[in-house]
């Protein structure tokens, strides 16, 4: 099975922005085990800006574009160093792929990306994809890595997209602010009420949130309906969004 796995900054790091080593080690071990079982893994990982914030001991995520790009350049190096080291311990070779929105929107560049990623999978490599925050601007950015994960999953014809989060799933309200919020175990369709319950942006170090994850699920569901593929989208320990499969 070809599986796309997306992980966000808040899942990879502590609140300080520093890497949560134990969690990342466990994640790399699980993905390595899935690969050892014969699955093809495409790993979409946020975290460049968040790790750069931690490494530079900044108080908060920068808001101006130039500083965000600079911090991303710092953090991406450390992020890939950690992944290369941890996956190497399980005898897996990783490859770094950095994309902008134009790489997915422009037909020739999209095809080049798809061909290259297919070749990496043929070679038994574990591709690690992130948005190229060092050069991305509002005009060329994908926007958030939940959307990027969905677009990559559709592009590589993944049979399953798993979106990892620091929240157990979709709730009727933000469980961190409302103790009475209830888990929604299954989402048969993305209604206006469901989208409203998702709220806004997630952590202070990331760009996503539950709304972005629902948008990602919608992209996969639309692709499954259009192409009649068995693309399924869901959330780790959370609600299942139904696609064609």
What is each model feature region?
Residues 1-217, 221-222, 229-244:
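Nucleotide/pyrophosphate-binding catalytic subdomain
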């Amino acid at each position: 099975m070809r599986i796309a796995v997306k992980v966000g900054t808040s899942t990879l790091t502590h609140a300080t922005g520093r890497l949560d080593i134990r969690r990342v080690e466990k994640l790399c071990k699980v993905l390595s085990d899935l690969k050892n079982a014969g699955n093809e893994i495409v790993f979409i990982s946020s975290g460049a800006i968040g790790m750069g914030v931690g490494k530079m001991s900044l108080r908060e995520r920068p808001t101006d574009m130039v500083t965000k790009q600079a911090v991303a350049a710092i953090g991406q190096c450390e992020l890939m160093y950690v992944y290369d080291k941890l996956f190497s311990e399980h005898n897996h070779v990783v490859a770094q792929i950095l994309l902008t929105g134009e790489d997915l929107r422009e037909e020739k560049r999209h095809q080049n990306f798809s061909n290259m990623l297919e070749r990496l999978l043929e070679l038994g490599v574990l591709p690690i994809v992130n948005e190229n925050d060092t050069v991305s601007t509002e005009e060329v950015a994908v926007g958030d890595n939940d959307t990027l994960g969905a677009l990559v999953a559709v592009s590589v014809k993944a049979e399953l997209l798993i979106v990892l989060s620091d929240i157990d799933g979709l709730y009727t309200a933000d469980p961190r602010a409302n103790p009475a919020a209830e888990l929604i175990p299954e989402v048969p369709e993305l209604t206006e009420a469901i989208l409203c319950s998702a709220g806004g942006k997630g952590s202070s170090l990331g760009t996503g949130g539950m709304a972005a994850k629902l948008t990602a699920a919608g992209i996969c569901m639309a692709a499954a309906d259009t192409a009649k593929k068995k693309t399924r989208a869901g959330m780790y320990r959370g609600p299942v969004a139904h696609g064609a499969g």
